[in-house]
Amino acid sequence: MNGNRFGRLFQVTTYGESHGEAMGVTVSGVPAGVELDEEAIQAQLDRRKPGQSMITTSRGEPDEVVVNSGVQDGYTTGTPIGMVIQNKDARSGKYEPYVTAPRPSHGDYTYSAKFGTRNWGGGGRSSARETVNWVAAGAVAEQVLDASEYDVEIKAHVNQIGDVEADDVSFEQILDHSEENDVRCADPEAAAEMQELIERYQEAGDSIGGSIYFECRGVPRGLGAPRFDGFPSRLGQAMFSIPATTGVEFGLGKDAVNVTGSERNEDWTFDDGESFDHVESEEGDPVPVGNDHGGLQGGITTGEPIYGEATWHAPTSIPKKQRSADWETGEEKDVQVVGRHDPVLPPRAVPVVEAMLYCTVLDFMLLAGRINPDRVDGNPGQYDTDYHPSSPDND
């Protein structure tokens, strides 16, 4: 099975199945000399882990990460970083009825049709359990960016569940308030309505979809390339790798269908040194007046905030009775998915979205030479045996 790696220079390779022994990720392309805080990695995993509230699955996974390579005395060595998260609360027995009778709208049949076999416990490789690897990788990417000269900030929050929409909020409000409720919505009134809606579907044995707003600040201009290597092209690929993603938008997104060219096109002016939020822009530089394009023009970053929205359909594992076709017996039959599952995805997907953004931004920064891919201090290829911060001579 291919398709388990993402990135060009900052490469993330994952493995593991939902009910296997462990989940794991190998991160290559991390420069040497980054002080890696393993507690910060764990903190991000804790934001994603199951069982954290009444509106998440009750599966009791501690999601404790073990970093087993690529780090010495707390600093990265430039070699691949390996991280492992053990699965400690898998219960595969409840999935035996679906071995030959695929659950509706899952990957059960398609995996079996393609490979002739599959790990059926908990959905195996197709499970959203796999996103724990991406969050670990994203936490590493965040720390590499923090160690650079660039002040990159990335944040997301749930802006819609079902028909309940949050009011538009500022980036600062998302930073300050998105973690204050179980839904991870920075609008407290909307969050309360969302929670009530989720619980109503949950009690009915059903599920509901939603969306997440994301924003990146401090990303310099000039990242990305035309066509297939454009910044939105690669970020879109990363977002669509998150299970159940049905749409990714940038800037005005789908609302652009109702906007004329003359309304959407943004005039250019000169930076006056006070009015614009553009990375690296100096007084007198040309800058676009607005940012309806979401910080992206021609597939390349403009230096303005990058923002957009990603959408998820309702979780497909629900206890409501549904119909399936058993390919072994040749009969149709009722199935009920009685395992432990989330009634909604966006609240736990927020750290996954942020992780995908961090991984993508760092990869582009390395590709553009904005960050030295060899080491956080010094020139690429510079030879210095005393460089590494853990060297005894640097005490």
UniProtKB/Swiss-Prot annotation:
It comes from the Archaea. Belongs to the chorismate synthase family. PANTHER family: CHORISMATE SYNTHASE. The keyword Flavoprotein applies. Reduced FMN (FMNH(2)). InterPro entries: Chorismate_synth, Chorismate_synth_AroC_sf, Chorismate_synthase_CS. This reaction introduces a second double bond into the aromatic ring system. FMN binds at R125, S126, S127, G298, H313, A314, P315, T316, S317, R340. Its EC number is 4.2.3.5. Pathway: Metabolic intermediate biosynthesis; chorismate biosynthesis; chorismate from D-erythrose 4-phosphate and phosphoenolpyruvate: step 7/7. The keyword Iron does not apply. One of its GO terms (cellular component) is cytosol. GO terms for biological process: amino acid biosynthetic process; aromatic amino acid family biosynthetic process; chorismate biosynthetic process. This is Chorismate synthase. Keywords: Amino-acid biosynthesis, Aromatic amino acid biosynthesis, FAD, Flavoprotein, FMN, Lyase, NADP. It catalyses: 5-O-(1-carboxyvinyl)-3-phosphoshikimate = chorismate + phosphate. Coiled coil: none annotated. Its cofactor is FMNH2. GO terms for molecular function: chorismate synthase activity; FMN binding. It is an enzyme of class 4 (lyase). Residues 264-292, 373-395 are annotated as: Disordered. NADP(+) binds at R48. Pfam families: Chorismate_synt.
